[in-house]
Amino acid sequence: MKRQLILEDGTVLIGTGFGGEIEKSGEVVFTTGMTGYQETLSDPSYCGQIVTFTYPLIGNYGINRDDFESIHPSVNGLIVNEICDHPSNFRNEISLNDYLKERNIPGLAGIDTRKLTRKIRQYGTLRGRLCNMDADVEYIVSQLKATVFTDHVKRVSTKDPYPSPGRGHRVVLVDFGMKHGILRELNKRDCDVIVVPYNTTAEEILRLSPDGIMLSNGPGDPKDVPEAIEMLKDIIGKVPLFGICLGHQLFALASGANTSKLKFGHRGLNHPVKNLATGKVAITSQNHGYAVEEESVENTELEITHVALNDGTVEGLRHKKFPAFTVQYHPEASAGPEDANDLFEDFLTMIENFKKEGEELCQNA
């Protein structure tokens, strides 16, 4: 079955279709990960996107029950050079092709993914549509140019609060499109977690008496989530806070900094990040199309703690007065390296220190 990818600039790439027999549009992006395709498909941060894998062979270990980052995949399509139809792994339960058919997600194989990746790197992220061979190219191009992708966070966030009980610190986890890996890391440390929707107010969060607040990852432009920015303006300084990815960007906006769209984003498992305090470099997992503008941090109460070595963009922030820090990358590493996993320990240490300071103030009052 032939299928084509039509880009908003008029480019047409023809290959072999697999997965769902449906036409879908989305923002065409690329990821450099050699593995972790199951986590990528189920990562809500990819909501509404058509993901191109730069590694030539995808699907060779199949799909299993353990590696999902959300219950429902949010991607709009998948592009690979070659798909493996006969996976071999002791955990394999279903092939990638069959999984995409079940979920009605279209795929395209047999195209030059290097050519597509170079185009995205040169011209920036492009809107595209996976469609059948009889599609009207001129009409599709005109529709793509007029399309605006918004409200992704609303689509992937939980609709109602729910608990993930533990005996340790109570952490309110604000879900902007949370990866399950973040929740797993908190559960591993016996945190008493309450997951809340993206539009939960500061008053509602504080009513839960949290010891700490965690801001999850999520898809799209942080400026599309004004409710969260207003919530954070009322929260910062009252409770220890740790943000990841979109949570990092929202924290920056609430603190007076600015964000902007990257030319083609950071997506992959091998992005080097430098800790400015220690000089150490961590290899990190990343997935974002927006970043905090470095110059916008200067007139705020934030300090830059980490930078990307590939392009110098801001990768970490800390508040100068209050117990709050954020990172642009994914310390939970699902999938990816675990170099930054100790940031969860730093968060819990910050909670403990904040509690001790409060107790000392009460004793001295």
Curated annotation (Swiss-Prot):
Pfam families, per this entry?
A: CPSase_sm_chain (PF00988), GATase (PF00117)
Q: Region CPSase: start and end of each range? A: 1-166, 1-169
**Sorted UniProt keywords:** Amino-acid biosynthesis, Arginine biosynthesis, ATP-binding, Glutamine amidotransferase, Ligase, Nucleotide-binding, Pyrimidine biosynthesis
Biological process (GO) annotations held by this record are: 'de novo' pyrimidine nucleobase biosynthetic process; 'de novo' UMP biosynthetic process; glutamine metabolic process; L-arginine biosynthetic process
Q: Tell me the residue numbers annotated for binding L-glutamine.
A: S45, G218, G220, L246, Q249, N287, G289, Y290
Entry superkingdom: Bacteria
Stated EC number for the protein is 6.3.5.5
| Catalytic activity reported | hydrogencarbonate + L-glutamine + 2 ATP + H2O = carbamoyl phosphate + L-glutamate + 2 ADP + phosphate + 2 H(+)
The record's listing under Gene3D superfamilies reads: 3.40.50.880, Carbamoyl-phosphate synthase small subunit, N-terminal domain
For this protein, the record's InterPro entries field holds: Anth_synth/Amidotransfase, CarbamoylP_synth_ssu, CarbamoylP_synth_ssu_N, CarbP_synth_ssu_N_sf, Class_I_gatase-like, CPSase_GATase1, GATASE
Catalytic site: C245 (nucleophile), H330, E332
Keyword Nucleotide-binding (UniProt): yes
Which SMART domains does UniProt cross-reference here?
CPSase_sm_chain
Q: CDD domains in the record, alphabetically?
A: GATase1_CPSase
Give this protein's Gene Ontology molecular function annotations. ATP binding; carbamoyl-phosphate synthase (glutamine-hydrolyzing) activity; glutaminase activity
Which SUPFAM superfamilies does this one have?
Carbamoyl phosphate synthetase, small subunit N-terminal domain, Class I glutamine amidotransferase-like
**HAMAP family hit by this protein:** CPSase_S_chain
Q: Which NCBIfam families match?
A: CPSaseIIsmall (TIGR01368), PRK12838.1 (NF009475)
Which PANTHER family does UniProt cross-reference here?
CARBAMOYL-PHOSPHATE SYNTHASE SMALL CHAIN, MULTIFUNCTIONAL TRYPTOPHAN BIOSYNTHESIS PROTEIN-RELATED
| Assembly with partners or alone | Composed of two chains; the small (or glutamine) chain promotes the hydrolysis of glutamine to ammonia, which is used by the large (or ammonia) chain to synthesize carbamoyl phosphate. Tetramer of heterodimers (alpha,beta)4.
Q: What does this protein do?
A: Small subunit of the glutamine-dependent carbamoyl phosphate synthetase (CPSase). CPSase catalyzes the formation of carbamoyl phosphate from the ammonia moiety of glutamine, carbonate, and phosphate donated by ATP, constituting the first step of 2 biosynthetic pathways, one leading to arginine and/or urea and the other to pyrimidine nucleotides. The small subunit (glutamine amidotransferase) binds and cleaves glutamine to supply the large subunit with the substrate ammonia.
Q: What is this protein called?
A: Carbamoyl phosphate synthase small chain
Source taxonomy lineage?
Answer: Bacteria, Bacillati, Bacillota, Bacilli, Bacillales
